[in-house]
């Protein structure tokens, strides 16, 4: 129903960027168990692309926004996690992605492929563990590690790899700031058995969520993805290098808080402060992460509400009726639709405009708070020799 929702979901909001992805649901599921699966699959693909051609025309008519097509994440056909399998489903998805890629090239739009990079990672990992998959529940929905890989691919496609959080290099012997990028360093002092300085970065480290969270039976965390992609190296470098220190070990503190004991050799090579969840700047980023997760939880209620409107009530002539007749119609669908059963409770609340208004104000408060507290602050960094 993408084309039916373009105005309400996209164009009415006057966006400057639009990303579009589709293919997983379009290609069907149990059709791959039927004898004429190939024929049914081709029909589903053609129906999807026919709808896309209409969407493409609408997007071409809008010349004040940048368009990006995304080749969606893969259906994992190769994991041995279980025997429930829609064989050749990802092949069907790839045919849709090929059409997306060609359309993007023809129209001068951006294009990002999530599918094949995720397939390649999965195949490599399955050589070591045949049950490895990004989609542990159903071969469809990526867990948090898979979502993190998708984020990495999206950032990399924008040419952002190599942009550091900050980079500092200090010659301790001469009390000399050799270089600094994306930050300010001041009040550099050589002290007995160490040194100290004030540090103000232009950005915050990315806080990797180490706890599995959010829907679809997730079991893995963002941090689990760090063994699969060079995210820390390419996107999350908060590097501190100190050369010509007296040989030994040093206590690293920031704003008086103990961070770690590190050797002069480690400091000579450079350490990545973004690896330390206990730094004040990392903790600041964590607060922002949790606030944004709270915003997401509220925004998800609107998603469930609108999905119910367009998937069930629109075809009944009850789009945004939000009345007893709409409720009664949904109750007819409830016994036979598990997805509706998951969304129904949110619809019964969101159907009231006063409730939606309160939720909207709450989200705005969260976003305003994020932008008030997302500015890096100056920190006192100190290295003290301990042995």
Sequence positions of predicted segments:
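Alpha-helical cap/lid subdomain in secreted, periplasmic
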Residues: 3-387
